[in-house]
């Protein structure tokens, strides 16, 4: 009888635990219940991992196609609508870049299908060096070029990618639901300037060594959080200014940014984490190669950096959230950047400014922008609104050096631009920002 008396309470306790485990999840708690749910937001995503092992992007020394998959690659879309019905679509890609021709084709289709003006489309790439080659030239390859398997694979993949991007953008628009937006930023410390210290005299033992711990960095982790009116977290758009180059193997992977997104999503069913690359043209993750940390592989380093970044995003989402209200305003223009060699035609370079009411200004620049741009733009636009600066957006045409780097020389200065491109680009940022005031 005593044994039965003991078994019954234990059974009841087990039943209660089972009911608790199988019951409704705890009620959502808003991080900022005082902020009006004045937006509509929608998310969608698609796997964009190549279906076959084609050539990889990022490292010129690669001599064969991919051989495996460490992680799926994704395209993700966030659609936002303010109270006046103005919409913005943001697309992030776990890929090397956003070819300008691809961006223009997607923009034209979204305008035709959904009435989204080209200025209200942002496309950003993580710049993972463990993704596929893309067709970077705007025109389709010729029949002769298509005889080359590498060219043919890149073109076929890029065509399929375009269809998936258009599809997820449309799905995100269809998913528009009432939402509350908040933002803030945290810090993450693994990004370091990868250029040598040009202030050291020739002959100094460290004159030609990188990284440069004293070099300029932007280690901010901005995060725009989206939650339902009831307080349930639906997604986050977050950024970091650093190359995705922990890895050098022959497997598909999103690198540290892919793992940061995975970690943010894994314990939140239905949650979408989207990574936006900052001005990381001269920034690398450190440590970043096997042997630097005994017993730790490249993949483990990518995962560790991903965890560090995800932890910073968690802090940015939860610590002192700043309410974001409308209106939504966006401006986009392309400026003409000349090359040193006059026979080379100038390049149309995209500059975009998106203002989220009076709370946040997002500046996006094309291609591999060095960190000087982010630091300068944040300094010059400083005011009541937060300032977030992204690179690798809407274009992929090589490195965009600052005036300082053009003067110093080195890897990031070798693209061949004429001088003063920094003044042209930053000047356009100020013009667009002033237009939206």
Predicted regions and their residues:
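Boundary at the C-terminal end of the N-terminal hydrophobic targeting segment
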Residues: 19-23
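Positively charged n-region of N-terminal signal peptides that target proteins for export
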Residues: 1-4
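Conserved beta-alpha junction segments in alpha/beta enzyme cores
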Residues: 26-124, 128-280, 284-310, 317-437
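General helical structural elements
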Residues: 6-7, 24
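Bacterial N-terminal signal peptides
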Residues: 7-16
